[in-house]
Each structure stands twice: as structure tokens, then as C-alpha cells.
From Swiss-Prot:
Disulfide bonds: none annotated. InterPro entries: Indigdn_synthA-like (IPR022830), PsuG (IPR007342). Catalyzes the reversible cleavage of pseudouridine 5'-phosphate (PsiMP) to ribose 5-phosphate and uracil. Functions biologically in the cleavage direction, as part of a pseudouridine degradation pathway. This is Pseudouridine-5'-phosphate glycosidase. The active site is at E25 (proton donor), K163 (nucleophile). PANTHER family: CARBOHYDRATE KINASE PFKB DOMAIN-CONTAINING PROTEIN (PTHR42909:SF1), ZGC:136858 (PTHR42909). Homotrimer. It comes from Symbiobacterium thermophilum (strain DSM 24528 / JCM 14929 / IAM 14863 / T). Its EC number is 4.2.1.70. It is an enzyme of class 4 (lyase). Substrate binds at K86, V106, S144, A145, D146.
Amino acid sequence: MKYLLSYTPEVREALDRNRPVVALESTIISHGMPYPENLRTAREVEEIVRSQGAVPATIAVIGGRCKVGLTDEELELLATSPEAVKVSLRDLPVVLARKSLGATTVATTATIAAAAGIEVFVTGGIGGVHRKSPGDPAQMWDVSADLTVLGRTDITVVCAGAKSVLDIGATLEVLETLGVTVLGYRTDRFPGFYTRDTGFGVDARVDTPEEAAAVIHARQQTMLPGGVLVVNPVPEEHAMDPDEVERHIADALKAMAAEGVTGKAVTPYLLARLKEVTSGRALQTNIALVKHNALVGAQIAVALKAGK
């Protein structure tokens, strides 16, 4: 993997000097938000990371290379190009071989970041176990590769929980089976992306970046496979009402089943539907939580380097 990596000078220098670096995914740019909000948010998130003393490394696949850190022109390309494809692990060899423009999912970003020696990765929300479509009890479980990658990759992922469109209980069961440590940042509850509490708990609560870093460092010392998931609830002023979100998701799932949407198109479809039916409020919540995660993730990355 390492010989396929290309770095921006800023990221390469930071890694060489053992400075804190924060990985960022690119699917949120190409598939998670519309233009121009996607480009503006990507730029603002990178600046938030820098403001805390860390270096941002947005990851994507461009020209047959795994890019660790993007130029502003590359960010704009991902934000505007209809040719950008969503790259999970199974897609990575194809996208590399064809030299396509690829936006990396949580699973692929985590894999590339770990190969580059980056310890902390910030995203909006992780994938997980999808809910079954109404009226189809025989439907197979759709389980995101994000979970299996977290179970085998030494990386810390900071997010606002699992996306609300997922089966949260089943997702947490898989994380437990894989041995992933789930930390709640200033919370005892597992958040659900748009909402602050899904009704499920976390493995442990941490209230400072230093406390989170201590747990991460202890896990690294154990040499256990897999990583740490730090869940950081969306700020209260931007959180959505859980009952409203559930109602919209139920309606969206019915529409999705009627339209035959499957596979990697599911999450973008559901997020777009939520944006539409909430008159853009879901998008604003998404932007707010990503920025909040960038702030906390950068602080944890700095604390992790300082504590070693």
C-alpha cells in the first residue's frame, strides 16, 4: 500500500516531524453534501484542524494514487465533478487501476490513513448495519465495511455516532464482537448523527482530549487488533428531534424500497431525502457536527502526540 501513497508537502513534513495529523474522508465532499456547501465545509474543516495545532490530511484517490492531503484544486474537483465515484475497500483496486477519481469512504480512508502512519481520523458518522426494508423480512443484512475495518485497523475514528438511517443496536453489537472500544466524548450515550442520544450507551466516557488520548495510547500498548471509536454528539443547538428524524427515515425507507435503491447508493439516497423533507435543516446539522468533530479530533490528535 505505501508505494501507492502520495502526500502534500504539508502532510509529509508533519509526518516526518512526528507532528499531529488528522485524516479526513472525501465521500462527504462528493456524495454527502451538495455544491457549494460541500466545498465550503471541506475548506472550513481543514482550517479548524489547523487552528488546534494539527495538520489536516483529506484522503482521496486521484490518477492511480492514494492522495494523503489534497490541494485546494483537488478539493474543488471532488466537490464539483460528476465523475467522482464512491470508493469502499472492494472498489479501491478498480479505481486505482483505471485511474478514476475516487472519494474514499470511512473504511477506505481509515485503511489509507493507517498505512500513512496517521493515528486519528475525523468523519461525520460511521456506516454500520442497515435497517431492513419494511415488509421484507427475508432481506439480507447490509453491513458496512466501516465496521470490519475498525475491527482490524489501529486508528481512532472521531464521529457523531453511526448515521441515523442505520440499525444502531445491531451496529453496536458488531462493534462489540469486533472488539472496538467505543468512547463517549462528554457523554454516556451513543449519539445518532442528527440526534444526541439513540437510547444506547457507550463503553466508557471521557471528558477531555487528554483522557481520550490516554485510553487510545493504552490500547496501542496492548497491541490488540482494531481501533477506538470516539463518539462526539452534535452540539445541542444543532441537534434534531429524534421522533421527527425517525418519522422521516421510515418514510424514506419505504420510498427507497419502492424505487429499488440498493448497495452503495443507499446512504446518499437517504441523506438527500432527509435534506429535502427537513427543508435543509438536516444538511445544516450535518455541517455543524462535522465541524465539531474536527475540533475534538484535532485536540485528541495533539494530546496523543503530547502524551507519548
